[in-house]
Amino acid sequence: YFGEHTQVTVMCHSCGWRQTDFIPAEGKKAGGWTLILENEEQLKSRIVRSSSCTVSILELDLEVNPGSSSTGYVSNVEGVLNRFTKIIDMVLGDLDDENSNEDMTRLKDMKYQIENVGKDDDVRLTLEFLDPHGHSMIIDQNATERDLTEAELESLPVGPDPAVFSKND
């Protein structure tokens, strides 16, 4: 359980644009969450990822920064890892024979590690959430929470700007 949250979804019925975010009922400060993935049970751990959160898999040097269309979501660790796998699959699909075998091998190794974390004792990965608004969390007894450094606060993207609507729209 991750406390009371409000889900805010703004959408345009004309064009289909949509933005979703999760805001905790209690005030939060900027923070980071880290979880070392060592067993299959951790894949079931609940997460809340807000639209301002940067998600990383440290050992693989993979990072997803919030962009202008970033949305928040509630999922589990496995769901977060699946999002990384889908991106790797897209990149692999875009590579052609002219690309180096080294790139393809590296991507396939990343995919193997993500798909086998918790199943293969030799695969351990660190999942990290950095959220300058403090709305994200990893809910697992082994997850650690920390304050963000000043350098992190200055360098982290904060996600999409809130939608602004005028009375004339």
Predicted regions and their residues:
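Long C-terminal interaction/binding lobes of large macromolecular proteins
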Residues: 1-3, 9-11, 17, 23-169
